[in-house]
Amino acid sequence: MLSLRLFLPDIWTADPARLNRAGVPLEHQGSRTKPEMAIEEIDRLCAAGVRFGCVLADAGYGLSAPFRQALSARGLRWAVGIPRHQKVYSTDVELVFPARKRGPSRMHPVPDQQSVPAHKILETATWRRVSWRRGTKGGLAARFAAMRIRVADGPAQRIGGRTAQHMPGEEAWLIGEHRSTGERKYYLSNLSADSSLRLLAAAIKARWVCEQAHQQLKEELGLDHFEGRSWTGLHRHALMSMMAYAFLQSRRLTAVGRKKKSHRPTTTAQSASNTTGHS
C-alpha cells in the first residue's frame, strides 16, 4: 500500500468554512473527481521512481474516458471494469464522408457503422472456461470471452438525424466474464493484441488482491475507525494503518520465503573418495 487520497464530495468543496474548520489545506480544497485524483497519484508515484506492471480499476474509474486516455498517454498498461452499456465499435470501423443529397458536404468524417453496447457485441463471441490462479480450495475459474474492438470514447458527433455518438477511439481488448452465479462483468484493457485469454483473465482478477488489502486495512487495522473531523488527524491515522499493513505484509512475505526454503528438495552429492572410477 503506497498511497491513499481523501475524496471530498461537492457538499464539502462548496463549503469553504467547513473545509477551514477541518483544516483542509488550500491546495486540496478544489473539486476533483476520483479519476482525476487517481491520475495525480499515479504521476506522483511514477515521479518517485515507483514501477508497476498494470493499472487496475473498477468500473467507477473504468467508465471514465479521460482516465483511460490519460493512462494510455503515459504509456501505462491498464485493465479496468466497465458498465455493460459501454459503447464500442468493431475493429474494421472506418471514417467516411457520406454524400449529401442537398446542402454542403460534411466537414468531418463519420464512422461507417453504429457503436453498440459491450454486452451486445460479445453475444456472438466464443466463451471459454479459464483458470487464472490456484486458490486455497483449488483452481479459480470462470467463463471468459474477449475480442479486439475500438472504444467509442472519441469526440461526440451527430450523424444524420440520429443522436450524437462518440467517434472511435483507441483499439483495445473487450473482455466478458460469466461467473458461476450467473452474473456477467465487462472489462477493457490495452494489453497487447497477442495477449492470451488466460493472461487477460489473470490481469483482471489481480484486482482481488487490492480489494483484500483495502478490506484488511479497514476491518483489521482500523482505517475505518477514525472518529475525528480533522484533516491532519485523519491523515495521521491513515498513515499508522498503512505502516501497520506494511509491517504485517513484510512478516507475511518473510514467512512465505521460509516456507518455500524448507520445502526445497535437498540433493546429496557423492564424494570423490567414494566414487568408483576406471583406470
Predicted features and spans:
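Extended hydrophobic-aromatic, low-complexity segments
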Residues: 199, 210-217, 253-256
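Short, conserved catalytic/metal-binding motifs centered on acidic residues
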Residues: 55-61, 78, 187, 208-217, ...
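Polybasic low-complexity intrinsically disordered regions
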Residues: 1-84
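Low-complexity, glycine/alanine/valine/leucine- and proline-rich hydrophobic stretches
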Residues: 167-172, 177, 200-204
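A short, flexible helix-boundary coil/loop motif
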Residues: 8, 15-30, 34, 39-43, ...
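Short gly/pro/ser/thr-enriched loop/turn and capping motifs at secondary-structure boundaries
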Residues: 85-90
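Extended, non-catalytic structural segments that build the interaction scaffolds
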Residues: 181-208
